């Protein structure tokens, strides 16, 4: 099957079920990272991922990795650590620093290019993208960022420069998101780290059904206000 080439004039995407099986989920290439195109993509279960120097590639893998916040897996060792945690956790206080941390945390190169950083910073300024920060004293030691779609949060990346810092970010955010009425955290593709924290795979069609029913159910406006979570 020929890979769809996106134009700069149209925000349309092919249906996700046209994505390739190998590599799993590759759907289209080209276009741009404008806020409108990114929001259009995520509302359709599509996200960009590409290496520096490559064209923009768009993906919708099958199966899809998700985390139901109420099913976050808290190991006994992590529970003990969290009970005596040296960290505090905040929301939307250092978005730029979090995305820089995620980019620099990749030892073998990163897909978080300058172009990607600018695109996500713009989404943050528009109120769509959000960051969770983990602090030890006044040092930022971990965090995560992603996109809010109603009762769904699309997690993009996380970083850790302190013991269990990224786990702390996801743990605290999962509890907060659930309390605020959040239903699902999109993890895109399953990896050992997110699987250990309770992420699971579901069919792409099931994820698209979640999107259809949850993405346009807004949370309270105060949900994303800069604040301390833990």
From Swiss-Prot:
Primary localisation category: cytoplasm
GO biological process terms, semicolon-separated: protein catabolic process
Molecular functions (GO terms): leucyl-tRNA--protein transferase activity
Subcellular location: Cytoplasm
Gene Ontology CC: cytoplasm
InterPro entries, alphabetized: Acyl_CoA_acyltransferase, Leu/Phe-tRNA_Trfase, Leu/Phe-tRNA_Trfase_C, Leu/Phe-tRNA_Trfase_N
Entry keywords, A to Z: Acyltransferase, Cytoplasm, Transferase
EC annotation from Swiss-Prot or TrEMBL: 2.3.2.6
Gene3D superfamilies for this protein: Leucyl/phenylalanyl-tRNA-protein transferase, C-terminal domain (3.40.630.70), Leucyl/phenylalanyl-tRNA-protein transferase, N-terminal domain (3.30.70.3550)
Pfam families (alphabetical): Leu_Phe_trans
Catalytic reactions of this protein: N-terminal L-lysyl-[protein] + L-leucyl-tRNA(Leu) = N-terminal L-leucyl-L-lysyl-[protein] + tRNA(Leu) + H(+); N-terminal L-arginyl-[protein] + L-leucyl-tRNA(Leu) = N-terminal L-leucyl-L-arginyl-[protein] + tRNA(Leu) + H(+); L-phenylalanyl-tRNA(Phe) + an N-terminal L-alpha-aminoacyl-[protein] = an N-terminal L-phenylalanyl-L-alpha-aminoacyl-[protein] + tRNA(Phe)
PANTHER family with a match to the protein in the record: LEUCYL/PHENYLALANYL-TRNA--PROTEIN TRANSFERASE, LEUCYL_PHENYLALANYL-TRNA--PROTEIN TRANSFERASE
Protein family per UniProt: Belongs to the L/F-transferase family.
Function description: Functions in the N-end rule pathway of protein degradation where it conjugates Leu, Phe and, less efficiently, Met from aminoacyl-tRNAs to the N-termini of proteins containing an N-terminal arginine or lysine.
Protein known as: Leucyl/phenylalanyl-tRNA--protein transferase
Organism: Erwinia tasmaniensis (strain DSM 17950 / CFBP 7177 / CIP 109463 / NCPPB 4357 / Et1/99)
Gene: aat
């Amino acid at each position: 099957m020929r890979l769809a080439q996106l134009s700069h004039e149209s925000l349309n995407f092919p249906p996700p079920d046209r994505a390739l099986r190998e590599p799993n989920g590759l759907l289209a290439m080209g276009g741009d990272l404008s806020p409108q195109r990114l929001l259009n993509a995520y509302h359709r279960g599509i996200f960009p991922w590409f290496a520096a120097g490559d064209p923009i590639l768009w993906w919708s893998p099958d199966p899809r990795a998700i985390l139901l916040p109420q099913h976050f897996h808290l190991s006994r060792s992590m529970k003990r650590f969290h009970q005596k945690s040296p960290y505090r956790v905040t929301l939307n206080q250092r978005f730029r620093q979090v995305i820089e941390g995620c980019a620099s945390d990749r030892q073998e190169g990163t897909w978080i290019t300058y172009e990607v950083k600018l695109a996500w910073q713009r989404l943050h300024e528009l109120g769509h993208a959000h960051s969770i920060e983990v602090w030890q004293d006044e040092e930022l030691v971990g965090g995560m960022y992603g996109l809010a779609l109603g009762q769904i949060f699309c997690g993009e990346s996380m970083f850790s420069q302190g013991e269990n810092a990224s786990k702390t970010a996801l743990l605290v955010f999962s509890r907060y998101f659930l309390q605020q009425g959040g239903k699902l955290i999109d993890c895109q593709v399953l990896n050992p780290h997110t699987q250990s924290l309770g992420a699971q795979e579901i069919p792409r069609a099931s994820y698209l059904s979640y999107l259809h029913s949850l993405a346009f159910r807004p949370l309270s406006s105060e949900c994303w206000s800069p604040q301390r979570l833990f």
